[in-house]
């Protein structure tokens, strides 16, 4: 049975999440509330919410966990040319936290293969907007000719970034935002981006799965670090074009 959490009930251990033999592997708990304080506590424990309209708030901690190590980010030859163009042409901009709510709404409206509707409900937007106002959630946005054409958002505590969703209204626009995020996190020695669940797209960019135990142990250490700044200059992306992945960083987490 999945426990029901009252307003003052703590999360159970992530080891109590449902296993692969269940119909919902990784499901840990359910609740009626999505208070910012509950959300913050969840992320610091390696837990995230994922549910649809009409459902209670469902809390997850899957095993294995999909991550992206910034040092392992893969850039194809074609995308390398795209990034060079973004750096060269002033009509391309990468902005941070310029339109957080707009990015969330665009992610909610983006069509997803095999998915009807969206899990980014009005309640989710309100909760993450509260985290954004507190400085704990951020958007990375791709702008072209003064128009926002792609982006992503996520949660950041200490030296840990938890990715949530992305969208694109122009070719490679979400990937450009991800590259900018990776460059920013590498510059500030962030070793891991939480990607939650495995997708072929994330795997093609260097994402991989690690054991939940390894993930949670890293989160515990990383969120205790001082927060990183969120001021951004797109020239930091140039570092991705001339630096090979660090073997030390790449080997830091068990496969």
UniProtKB/Swiss-Prot annotation:
Keywords for this protein: Acyltransferase, Cytoplasm, Transferase
Location(s), subcellular: Cytoplasm
Biological process (GO), any one: protein catabolic process
First-level EC class: transferase
Pfam families xref list: Leu_Phe_trans
Principal cellular location given in the protein's record: cytoplasm
Gene3D superfamilies for this protein: Leucyl/phenylalanyl-tRNA-protein transferase, C-terminal domain, Leucyl/phenylalanyl-tRNA-protein transferase, N-terminal domain
Reaction(s) this enzyme catalyzes, per UniProt: N-terminal L-lysyl-[protein] + L-leucyl-tRNA(Leu) = N-terminal L-leucyl-L-lysyl-[protein] + tRNA(Leu) + H(+); N-terminal L-arginyl-[protein] + L-leucyl-tRNA(Leu) = N-terminal L-leucyl-L-arginyl-[protein] + tRNA(Leu) + H(+); L-phenylalanyl-tRNA(Phe) + an N-terminal L-alpha-aminoacyl-[protein] = an N-terminal L-phenylalanyl-L-alpha-aminoacyl-[protein] + tRNA(Phe)
GO cellular component: cytoplasm
Known EC number: 2.3.2.6
Residues forming coiled coils: none
Keyword Transferase: yes
Example of a GO MF term: leucyl-tRNA--protein transferase activity
Origin: domain of life: Bacteria
Job of this protein: Functions in the N-end rule pathway of protein degradation where it conjugates Leu, Phe and, less efficiently, Met from aminoacyl-tRNAs to the N-termini of proteins containing an N-terminal arginine or lysine.
Similarity comment: family membership: Belongs to the L/F-transferase family.
HAMAP family in UniProt: Leu_Phe_trans
Protein name, entry field: Leucyl/phenylalanyl-tRNA--protein transferase
Native organism taxonomy: Bacteria, Pseudomonadati, Pseudomonadota, Betaproteobacteria, Burkholderiales
Gene name tied to this protein: aat
């Amino acid at each position: 049975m999945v426990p029901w959490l009252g307003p003052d009930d703590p999360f159970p251990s992530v080891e109590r999440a449902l296993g692969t033999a269940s119909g919902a592997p990784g499901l840990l708990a359910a609740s009626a509330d999505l208070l910012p304080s509950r959300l913050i506590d969840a992320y610091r424990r390696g837990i995230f919410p994922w549910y649809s309209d009409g459902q209670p708030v469902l809390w997850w901690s899957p095993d294995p966990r999909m991550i992206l190590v910034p040092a392992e980010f893969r850039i194809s030859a074609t995308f390398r040319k795209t990034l060079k163009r973004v750096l060269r042409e002033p009509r391309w901009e990468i902005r941070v936290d310029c339109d957080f709510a707009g990015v969330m709404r665009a992610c909610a409206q983006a069509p997803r293969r095999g998915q009807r509707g969206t899990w980014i409900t009005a309640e989710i937007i309100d909760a993450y907007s509260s985290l954004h106002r507190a400085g704990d959630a951020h958007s990375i946005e791709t702008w072209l000719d003064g128009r926002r054409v792609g982006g992503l958002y996520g949660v950041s505590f200490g030296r840990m970034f938890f990715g949530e969703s992305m969208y694109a209204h122009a070719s490679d626009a979400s990937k450009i935002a991800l590259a900018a995020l990776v460059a920013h996190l590498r510059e500030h020695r962030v070793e891991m981006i939480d990607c939650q669940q495995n997708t072929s797209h994330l795997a093609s960019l260097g994402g991989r799965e690690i054991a939940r135990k390894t993930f949670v142990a890293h989160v515990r250490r990383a969120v205790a670090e001082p927060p990183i700044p969120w001021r951004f200059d797109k020239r930091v992306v140039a570092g991705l074009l001339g630096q090979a992945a660090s073997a030390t960083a790449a080997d830091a987490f068990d496969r």
